[in-house]
Amino acid sequence: MALSKKPTTGMKDILPEEMQIRDYVISVIKDTYGKFGFTSIETPCVENIANLSSKQGGDNEKLIFKILKRGEKLNVAAATTEEEVVDSGLRYDLTVPLVRYYSNNAASLPSPFKALQMGNVWRADRPQRGRYRQFMQCDIDILGEPSNLAEIELILATTTTLGK
């Protein structure tokens, strides 16, 4: 079988020129948010399917690229439900992984905790013109700060970053 030269529908190759621009923008974002006290974190791109799936269903359920179980855990022929063959999925945004990360590590983190995340996310929806199934997302959050001043700080940090 011949090699398909085009990426899968909804995916994109990034050429060196665009990668240089992307790297520069990422460095400006990290530098600016860092001056506001945001700390970079990284979470796995694969999350437990139970964390990604909401109990109410909804639109997010349709966004998940589901990953089949492997090895002894996978028995497709005997499976009667999706849960029997799927145990994880690719993250569709950075919020769910952040919640899991914070709940697992809160005792080791400062309070309030200012998180900066940048990473690829995947959405299993039908790509429309100019949209992709894989793209980079940037997210800042302040956890453990009950006042509305945190919201103002998020806005100030973002407008400062976008102004550069």
Where do the PLM segments sit?
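TRNA-recognition modules of translation machinery and tRNA-sensing kinases, especially anticodon-binding
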Residues: 1-164
